[in-house]
Amino acid sequence: MTQRSQIATSFLPLPGSAPVEWRIEPGLTAYPDALAFMEARAEAIRSGGAGEMVWLVEHPPLYTAGTSARIEDLIEPDRFPVFSAGRGGEYTYHGPGQRVAYVMLDLKRRREDVRAFVAALEQWIIGTLAAFNVRGERREDRVGVWVVRPDRPRLPDGSPAEDKIAAIGIRLRRWVSFHGIAINVEPELTHFGGIVPCGVQDHGVTSLVDLGLPVGMADLDLALKSAFEDVFGPVAALPAEVARKTG
């Protein structure tokens, strides 16, 4: 099987397609509200009643369980609310200081290839991190984007320590995607301690600020947009983004 690192990651739409709507939500978004919005929007995209969309949000502290989540990986079930997400993957944490990008795209207009779509999402994240001179890397045995930590002791097997900086969890229904990615800007990293993030015990989590970078959410959002257009094509910003930048 072809490794994800060898898959072509261009997911440009068919010629003549409308730009992807790009919306930045102010404040904290309740997770049930986000689920309801994504379900409705994905159905509207499938039926032709709405266009593709990327929705950037922050959530209050919570854990979500993907379809592969194991109950033993929920270490502190009473620490934060726990939601069944319906996406792929295992447990993850969302909270303030973490940018969640919900990606609602019609892959019939792009490429009907799930593995290539995951690789494209990883490339989007890697391109975003590169704007801050952070080398994000993919791993064939685990989804997400990782950074090597030469400042940390090596693992027992002698391999370099590495931390996860971004998670990916998606769902496709009749080739329309929803759910998406999460990048750690400045979340409270101790909040990840209530779970085994994504079922991976041997590696930790990090953030842009933890890596020593003075990056804010607005900085990340600009980099996200530029890197998204490289992989997925043009976007059209909604008024919410303008309000966020000037508010």
Curated annotation (Swiss-Prot):
One Gene Ontology term of the molecular function aspect: lipoyl(octanoyl) transferase activity
Listed CDD domains: LipB
Active site, per annotation: C198 (acyl-thioester intermediate)
Disulphide connectivity of cysteines: none
Compartments, record wording: Cytoplasm
Residues of the site described as Lowers pKa of active site Cys: K164
EC id: 2.3.1.181
GO terms under biological process: protein modification process
Residues engaged in binding substrate: R87, G88, G89, E90, Y91, T92, Y93, H94, A167, I168, G169, G180, I181, A182
Pfam families: LplA-B_cat
Other noteworthy facts: In the reaction, the free carboxyl group of octanoic acid is attached via an amide linkage to the epsilon-amino group of a specific lysine residue of lipoyl domains of lipoate-dependent enzymes.
Family, per entry: Belongs to the LipB family.
Function: Catalyzes the transfer of endogenously produced octanoic acid from octanoyl-acyl-carrier-protein onto the lipoyl domains of lipoate-dependent enzymes. Lipoyl-ACP can also act as a substrate although octanoyl-ACP is likely to be the physiological substrate.
Protein name: Octanoyltransferase
